[in-house]
Amino acid sequence: MKNKNILEFLKKRGYIYQGSNFDLIEKELIKGTSFYIGFDPTADSLHVGHFLTMMAVKHLQKAGNNPVIVVGGGTGSVGDPSGRSEIRKILDRKTIDYNCECLKKQMSKFISFEGKNKAVMVNNADWLLKINWIEFLREFGVCFSVNKMLAAEAFKVRFEQESGLSFLEFNYMLMQAYDFYYLNQNYNVNIQLGGSDQWSNILAGVDLIRRKSSKEAFALTLNLLTKHDGTKMGKTATGAIWLDKNKTSPYEFYQYWLNIDDQDVERFLLLLTELDDKTISDLCKEKGKKIVEAKKVLASELTKMIHGQEELDKAIEQSKAAFENASDNLPTYELKASDLNNDYSIANILVVTKLSPSKAESRRLITSNAVSVNETKITDVNTKLEDLKIDQTNFTLHKGKKNHIKVIINK
């Protein structure tokens, strides 16, 4: 893709939301430039929503541009209020450092850190934690208008709510703007890439660079990963869909993509895979069985990309086993009897095995005839293991048509 119009490609595939000057951004990306994208270490793994961004970075790098990945060890101590209705939980230093290391390891699977336009990964704690507060206020505080900051959507929404906006969070925009300025000065970065909810923060950095160094820098934002109805992608009843196999197993990951809405398949193939446009169009031009095949291609491409061919093969075999009710090959959930706290109800077992987020949801699943143990449909919310004529230490638990696990209880 080198020397091609990568910006037009990204627009066509559905990545781009907004840009501060598309004509100049296009010229910069065609000739090859340095850009940065930031990730705050609020968890020890990326989730599906992050993967859209990682794919955009991957395309930009393949087109000859240099990615600078900023892990927010410093900004993560404050928390971004964008898209939040309440203050984020403040993480301690040890947790932030651990999360940063996990993210570094995970990103290296998708972005090249070798070669002519290799990616560089930096931690903004390396410069933010060294800042003298008084000196920062004197040199950079004068560059920011409180009026303009309060007009930003992220601040405006919080400011009008009862929970309000903490002074800690109010500083986030200044810190992110300073990141852009620092990277512009030290890494020659002149484009910041971010989600559509980061527009105000990125523009603050563009303005700071112009004020302090009279250089031109640019903002480029991406669409958030959403379903066709506009709701956020990457969440299930039991939580987020993580890229770390210890948080979301390859089997669960594979199943998640098999079960997406038909209307989302083509868009996700365009955004999350490297398949060419014609292949994707051919896969999605017909409905019915054809769209089911397209979902299998999507699930296979993403599972292989994230977890590798071996884990994909296992996920496919487990899916076949579940469909054929061959429990020997199902994913196994092993627990101790003590994990159940003397509550052997099916409702509680659903929660402990993470098939349900709560007993209330378990009861709802049972009353809607979505739960079975081995071949027995569970219809009473009070049903316990002892009520069933089964081996109470080794059985198959089913939720709906797609979620099946083998449960082993060690006494």
UniProtKB/Swiss-Prot annotation:
This enzyme's EC code(s) = 6.1.1.1
Residues that bind L-tyrosine: Y36, Y172, Q176
Q: Where in the cell is it found?
A: Cytoplasm
Coiled-coil region list: none
Tell me the keywords, alphabetical order.
Answer: Aminoacyl-tRNA synthetase, ATP-binding, Cytoplasm, Ligase, Nucleotide-binding, Protein biosynthesis, RNA-binding
Keyword Repeat belongs to the record? no
GO molecular function terms listed in the Swiss-Prot or TrEMBL record: ATP binding; RNA binding; tyrosine-tRNA ligase activity
Q: Which reaction does it catalyse?
A: tRNA(Tyr) + L-tyrosine + ATP = L-tyrosyl-tRNA(Tyr) + AMP + diphosphate + H(+)
* Residue ranges annotated as motif 'KMSKS' region: 232-236
Looking at the record's lineage, which domain of life comes first?
Bacteria
A GO cellular component annotated for this chain's UniProt record is: cytosol
- Listed Pfam families: SYY_C-terminal (PF22421), tRNA-synt_1b (PF00579)
Q: Which cysteines are disulphide-bonded?
A: none
UniProt motif 'HIGH' region: location: 41-50
The record ties this protein, via InterPro entries, to: aa-tRNA-synth_I_CS, aa-tRNA-synth_Ic, Rossmann-like_a/b/a_fold, S4_RNA-bd_sf, SYY-like_C, Tyr-tRNA-ligase, Tyr-tRNA-ligase_bac-type, Tyr-tRNA-ligase_bac_1
Query: Which residues belong to any copy of the S4 RNA-binding domain?
Result: 344-409
Any GO BP: tyrosyl-tRNA aminoacylation
Q: What is its main location?
A: cytoplasm
**Top enzyme class:** ligase
Q: PANTHER family annotated for this entry?
A: TYROSINE--TRNA LIGASE, MITOCHONDRIAL, TYROSYL-TRNA SYNTHETASE
HAMAP family for this protein: Tyr_tRNA_synth_type1
Q: Which family does it belong to?
A: Belongs to the class-I aminoacyl-tRNA synthetase family. TyrS type 1 subfamily.
Quaternary structure annotation from Swiss-Prot or TrEMBL? Homodimer.
Its biological purpose: Catalyzes the attachment of tyrosine to tRNA(Tyr) in a two-step reaction: tyrosine is first activated by ATP to form Tyr-AMP and then transferred to the acceptor end of tRNA(Tyr).
| The protein's name | Tyrosine--tRNA ligase
| Species for this entry | Malacoplasma penetrans (strain HF-2) (Mycoplasma penetrans)
Q: Which gene encodes it?
A: tyrS
